[in-house]
Amino acid sequence: MTFETISVTLEEGKTLVFETGKIARQANGAVLARMQETWVFSSVCAATLEEPVDFLPLRVDYQEKFSSIGKTLGGFIKREGRPTEREILTSRLIDRSMRPSLPNRLMQDVQILSYVWSYDGVTLPDPIAICGVSAALAISDIPQINIVAGVRVGFINNTWVVNPTKAEMDVSRMELVLAGTEKAILMIEGHCDFFTEEQVIEAIEFGHKHIVTICKAIEDWQKQIGKEKNTSAVVPLPEQVQTAVNTLVEGKFSDLLQIKEKKAFEAASKQLENDIVEKLQEENEIFTPLNIKTAFKQAKSDYMRSLIRKQGLRSDGRSVTTIRPISIDTSFLPRTHGSCLFTRGETQTVAVCTLGSEAMAQRYEDLNGEGLAKFYLQYFFPPFSVGEVGRIGSPGRREIGHGKLAEKALSHALPDPAKFPYTIRIESNITESNGSSSMASVCGGCLALMDAGVPIKTPIAGIAMGLILDDDHVTILSDISGLEDHLGDMDFKVAGNAEGITAFQMDIKVEGITPEIMQAALAQAKSGRQNILETMKATLASPKTDLSQYAPRIETMQIKPNKIATVIGPGGKQIRQIIEEAGVQIDINDSGLVSISASSPQAIEKAKSIIEGLVGEVEVGKIYEGRVTSIVPFGAFVEILPGKEGLCHISEFSKQRIENVGDFVKQGDILPVKLLSINEKGQYKLSHKATLSE
């Protein structure tokens, strides 16, 4: 293969370049995509499946090499291994962008690998990776329905910006990553600062305009150098199988859908499927169990769609806008800082809020350096939540993605860290699942925050919207169930308060949807969100005014940066002494902000007093509660601040004459003294009798 390259300019200074033919020439497709000095290499490979499967076996792995910034990993192991959270989230973005563009019943195992080989700290790599993967897929022989591209959109200084720089994203009020084709949107993921539905659509349309430009460039490149597609890898379902299955299920789905409980419905549905497989699999070689099951799934989807289109009724009997019954139980757990049992239909979470000091913050390291997350939400999806047996271990990609979406949704409602200096951890423990568990995590997490006494700006709720798209007939569903997610065309999650949006995520199974459909879905989502918020407010209208008795107390104080070393002491000796003496936890940042946490206000005050003593400057004329450190014939030395002591002469103890200082005070006594003066040598002159008249 010869070396080939194309370029596409999005805005001035933002030119995306694709190269192929020099690297990884044995892959089905391989592209080096670059913008400025951020270079991302992507490859796609396919292998024929040994056994046909009823799903698309697509695997995506994105990795950020630390060598791309001239560094190696810290610690003993220097080789990149377990993916970071950011790498997992980007892998999901690529997967969700590419999956709708691959044909159903593609009988190939497809693997996508994407590596950041060079990162300039300016141009963010994930949209480049999406485009690079799409270009590699386009020029490969792997079948593809449509060419895809992806961009990031930011909102900086009231202006939409495509593929903003790292510095621009740090001040952007929105982060939106979207992917699509020339004609439609396939995937969106983002969060924003209470934007309206109109603003979100405006951002999507702005981003899609640039997606069209990239798609056209990749399409032209494909026509010039692309391999012939291996269409034999796509095995359509024989019409004879679908017809036979449709005949056998006729009239039976109406009885099946009378079963409202999820597990009972699934059992009955599985039994019906098995009966049909048993009846048909001996017909001839095309009636394989896989083909029959695929046809059964299609027949079930067709019936559900027909029911919605003709009667406006869903599989569980709801109308298209009806939300499942909600029940809420706050302060559900007695010893946690805040908790909520949130149930919506057959989806349920036990959400828990835990407050702590900076020591509880989540530390991370990526190409942009080390960071500290003082708010994070962790989502747990144990197998019992769907009545199954499964592994327990490190979180899967789905758990990471759902947790991050809920975290972003709630993050915009958090109080100013300067006024509420706590690290906040929310865990969402999914105990039942029948659709929309990530949005249940938003609702339950918000109520747990309020139950913990976190002064959030506004309550946040989330809802998942679905879509049934048949020819020109569009039906939008509110609060979709697991079945509607499985058989429908869209899963569009939207979170926010009553007026604005804070987070959103959309995945589709069709070839794309238009901004007009998304606009209708967002409008219906707003109505549903407001309905859920009213239910939440009926249980807990506002955050509790007091923290839990089991939550630590945290206060902050500001010291001069040049005094940080004084508080820490040689080898940390001084700060360890304060922690031990006062019974507190202390964190100090580079600006001199000191965070003190303890179980009691008294312990915090003691620590503050010690620190103030260490960093405080003595003032002439000020009275101090000093400690007698030693007694001499002519007076006593008194420590007025840690490390700062002066002489209280025998004549300064009393208005009456005294003969022996030892008769008046003992070493270790607390003695009020007034600082009279500081001589040229920096020595302090103290007086006790000067305090007697004050």
From Swiss-Prot:
Entry-linked SUPFAM superfamilies: Eukaryotic type KH-domain (KH-domain type I), Nucleic acid-binding proteins, Polynucleotide phosphorylase/guanosine pentaphosphate synthase (PNPase/GPSI), domain 3, Ribonuclease PH domain 2-like, Ribosomal protein S5 domain 2-like
Catalysed conversion reaction: RNA(n+1) + phosphate = RNA(n) + a ribonucleoside 5'-diphosphate
Enzyme Commission number: 2.7.7.8
GO biological process terms held by the UniProt record: mRNA catabolic process; RNA processing
Keyword list, A-Z: Cytoplasm, Magnesium, Metal-binding, Nucleotidyltransferase, RNA-binding, Transferase
Positions of Mg(2+) binding: D485, D491
Molecular functions per Gene Ontology: 3'-5'-RNA exonuclease activity; magnesium ion binding; polyribonucleotide nucleotidyltransferase activity; RNA binding
Main EC class the enzyme belongs to: transferase
UniProt-annotated location(s): Cytoplasm
Gene it is expressed from: pnp
Known role: Involved in mRNA degradation. Catalyzes the phosphorolysis of single-stranded polyribonucleotides processively in the 3'- to 5'-direction.
GO cellular component terms attached to this protein's record: cytosol
Cofactor dependency: Mg(2+)
A Pfam family per the record: RNase_PH_C
Name of the protein this chain belongs to: Polyribonucleotide nucleotidyltransferase
Family: Belongs to the polyribonucleotide nucleotidyltransferase family.
InterPro entries, per database record: ExoRNase_PH_dom1 (IPR001247), ExoRNase_PH_dom2 (IPR015847), ExoRNase_PH_dom2_sf (IPR036345), KH_dom (IPR004087), KH_dom_type_1 (IPR004088), KH_dom_type_1_sf (IPR036612), NA-bd_OB-fold (IPR012340), PNPase (IPR012162)
PROSITE patterns noted in UniProt: KH_TYPE_1, S1
Domain annotation S1 motif: ranges: 621-689
Domain KH: 552-611
